[in-house]
Amino acid sequence: MQGTKIRLLAGSLLMLASAGYVQADALQPDPAWQQGTLANGLQWQVLATPQRPSDRIEVRLQVNTGSLTESTQQSGFSHAIPRIALTQSGGLDAAQARSLWQQGFDPKRPMPPVIVSYDSTLYNLSLPNNRNDLLKEALTYLANVSGKLTITPETVNHALSSEDMVATWPADTKEGWWRYRLKGSALLGHDPAEPLKQPVDAAKIQAFYEKWYTPDAMTLIVVGNIDARSVAEQINKTFGTLKGKRETPAPVPTLSPLRAESVSIMTDAVRQDRLSIMWDTPWQPIRESAALLRYWQADLAREALFWHIQQELT
């Protein structure tokens, strides 16, 4: 009887969620949210949040390229480029660059400075509030990353001998369940954590960088208690000089549909056997409202199923 009640509750919640989605007014854009496109194609978005003056200033640069754009001979290039970037001063003097990275992460919610995936590379900076000087330096650094890196045998060797601060998405590309999901997908041969093949050819990395790191394939996002107009002007001044245009479309990452079957996966990552029920949900971060709705509905279903199983076990 209890299980029937929970199933009815889950069904009601799902129907309410669906009905609410249909009947709700369309979301209106936040008037504080500004966006634009520079003449070279770079897209920018700025959100001023004066109502949250103590929040840190979040800066993100997304480049629409990742390991899926690599050929077999280029394996590891997409991971190596941000490693090279993190060892250079990015148009700043050494003291400025050191200060930027010392203050450029949130100690309460730390993020990797760069995350490389199959189809994107994300540069992350979290700056203290009321530090317009640091924001200006951050934009200068990211503009340098976007098209002015120095890639030579010396800079490559220096990067490879330094600590690897670049993370991947998914975080563990060798994890058993993820490897199972990759079956039948082109992603299988394009691991974003793959190291460079030896011997390393810096000229080929430079050519890859110039081909895929083009401003028309980049999006810059700045959020915080900032002067939006001033930041927009600074973006135009700092990033407007970048050159290059994407001539080859980047491959689109896709996974095969998840089959309804039971599988056994062996791994050393857990000490106790684990029973999991997995949904065929998108693996990429949520970027649009339809994906958010699917996530909410799946989350309600998961919660109802958890209640039911917990009740049966107790």
Segments and roles (model prediction):
Residues L188, T219-Q284:
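An aromatic/glycine/proline-enriched structural segment found at the starts
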Residues M1-Q23:
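Gram-negative bacterial Sec-dependent N-terminal signal peptides
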Residues T87-G91, L125-A159, E312:
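M16/insulysin-pitrilysin zinc metalloprotease superfamily fold
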Residues E58, Q74-P82, A94-Q102, S120, ...:
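Extracytoplasmic/secreted envelope proteins and their assembly/folding machinery
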Residues E58-S126, D172, L187-P192, E303-T314:
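M16/MPP (pitrilysin/insulinase) zinc-metallopeptidase core fold and M16-derived inactive scaffolds
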Residues A138, V166-P215, L275, W279, ...:
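Scaffold signal of the M16-like zinc-metallopeptidase fold and its non-catalytic homologs
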Residues A97-L100, K148-T168, D227, R246-R259, ...:
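Acidic/histidine-enriched alpha-helical segments
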Residues Q28-W33, A39-L42, R52-Q62, T72-F77, ...:
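Extracytoplasmic
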